[in-house]
Amino acid sequence: MAEPELQLVARRIRSFPDFPIPGVLFRDISPLLKDPDSFRASIRLLANHLKSKHGGKIDYIAGLDSRGFLFGPSLAQELGLGCVLIRKRGKLPGPTVSASYALEYGKAELEIQKDALEPGQKVVIVDDLLATGGTMCAACQLLGQLRAEVVECVSLVELTSLKGREKLGPVPFFSLLQYE
């Protein structure tokens, strides 16, 4: 990985203690989005990883609602691919399939349009951050319902202490930056 580019990305992640609740250290990507050079570097680094690992064997990038939408289309463009959207329940028109996942208090659902992917198509799921892995795991299950193949999940930031990568089981996972 290009170390100067990775440092450029890392310098644009801010930390806010005790947000949104006491005891949480929030990782803010807003400065990265404000800086076109840092944002381009993050996309280039993710794209280079995917090219080296999968070559031309990816059909689509799937962006997760909502901050995965910030990275998904740009990553797809960098790779010459299309991007499909995985949304929170009730946000997509037409026939959809859904998958539930647990939240701290209750549950949530993700949806994708039934015709978004064909069986056997190879997909990379992208989000800004992996924490507990609940959302990413639900996205993998959702694409499984369409019989698409999730070849990898990627994120800009991974909070390693929350062990979200373990929830993904055998699905490969990659992150640019890791924090406790």
Curated annotation (Swiss-Prot):
Membrane-spanning intervals of the chain: none
Originating species: Dipodillus campestris
Function: Catalyzes a salvage reaction resulting in the formation of AMP, that is energically less costly than de novo synthesis.
Modified residues (N6-acetyllysine): 114
Gene Ontology annotations of biological process type: adenine salvage; AMP salvage; purine ribonucleoside salvage
Phosphotyrosine: modified positions: 60
One Pfam family linked to the record: Pribosyltran
Pathway it works in: Purine metabolism; AMP biosynthesis via salvage pathway; AMP from adenine: step 1/1
HAMAP family, alphabetized: Aden_phosphoribosyltr (MF_00004)
Assembly notes: Homodimer.
List of residues that carry Phosphoserine: 15, 30, 66
UniProt record similarity statement: Belongs to the purine/pyrimidine phosphoribosyltransferase family.
Modified residues (N-acetylalanine): 2
Subcellular location: Cytoplasm
Residues modified as Phosphothreonine: 135
Keyword set, alphabetical order: Acetylation, Cytoplasm, Glycosyltransferase, Phosphoprotein, Purine salvage, Transferase
Reaction catalysis annotation: AMP + diphosphate = 5-phospho-alpha-D-ribose 1-diphosphate + adenine
PROSITE patterns found in the cross-reference section: PUR_PYR_PR_TRANSFER
GO cellular component: cytoplasm
Protein name (Swiss-Prot/TrEMBL): Adenine phosphoribosyltransferase
EC annotation from Swiss-Prot or TrEMBL: 2.4.2.7
UniProt-recorded Gene Ontology molecular function terms: adenine binding; adenine phosphoribosyltransferase activity; AMP binding
